[in-house]
Amino acid sequence: MDIKHNTPERDEFRATDGADVALWRWPQSKARPTLHWAHATGFHGRLYRPLLDELATDVNVLAWDMRGHGASAGAANVSTFRGWETYYRDMTALLDSQDEPVWLAGHSIGATTSIMAAARRPDKVLGLILAEPVIMDPVQGLKLGLAKLLRQSHRLSLAAGAARRRRVFDSHAAALDNYRGRGGFKTWPEAWLEAYVQHAFVPQEDQLQLACSPEWESTTFAHTEHNPWPGIRQLRCPVIALAAEHGSTFSPAAQKRLQTLLPSADVRVVAGTTHFLPMEQNDTVRDAIQQLALSGCREN
């Protein structure tokens, strides 16, 4: 299949609270395995088109816009938000909407959400490919859990920084110029930056406004999962976990503990990468997904 023709179409599924969550579908074929990709906080599914368009030649690709993000911005509701548990429930509802088991892959919160959904619906998940999952070791988790208990987690750097994020631009070109070479975007190839900007905004009169509001992004960071281990212990499917060499959200101590709990898991540190591993090492993520999703294997 020609990569140029791998254009996703919008679909949606109904979350348990009645909200509609956008789901992007690349061209599908019954003969191929299905893979769902879950994006990182503040982003959207079509950001990952440089990766997903390639994968769509071999697998049926799905990618949601997480609640409050991208085309699902309208599903944001702070009054009913229950931290990352809300996203876990949404992903579980997505799995329930599928006729057949699927492979789950994701980046950052998307990877962690995939873990929790797989733990809750083991019959619906064939395996996990995790790129920079947010998996804290017990010491990190204790500190964050205490900050959340004391209602101070909104002061943490990621949450505070997101709350200050610029939300309005005059044009897509102005947004590109603002992001290029700055902050977390420093290591992004141009194609990735363009894919992000293309679908990150909604019209606001004669300007553009971030679809994922700074308040929603900040709230999501403030509720970062501090104890994913009960879910990890329940996993029974194949797992590949890719960790960054620098500034990883999947610390060496957490890697060691996961490997102890899941001896068959394939844990790899990708040299030279940061938390934005999928953008920096697109081929590495693609190869890991193909290794599992095209293998036809499944642990029982």
Please identify what each model-predicted range represents.
Residues M66-A105, L146, D287:
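Active-site loop/oxyanion-hole signature of alpha/beta-hydrolase fold enzymes
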Residues A163-A222:
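Conserved alpha/beta-hydrolase catalytic His-Asp/Glu region
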Residues V270-N282:
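Catalytic histidine-centered segment of alpha/beta-hydrolase-like enzymes
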Residues A22-A76:
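Conserved HGGG/HGGXW glycine-rich cap/lid loop of the alpha/beta-hydrolase fold
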Residues E100-L144:
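Conserved hydrolase catalytic core segment
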Residues H199-T260:
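Conserved serine/cysteine hydrolase catalytic core
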Residues L126-V168:
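Flexible "cap/lid" loop of the alpha/beta hydrolase fold
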Residues M279-Q291:
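Post-His helix in hydrolase/transferase enzymes
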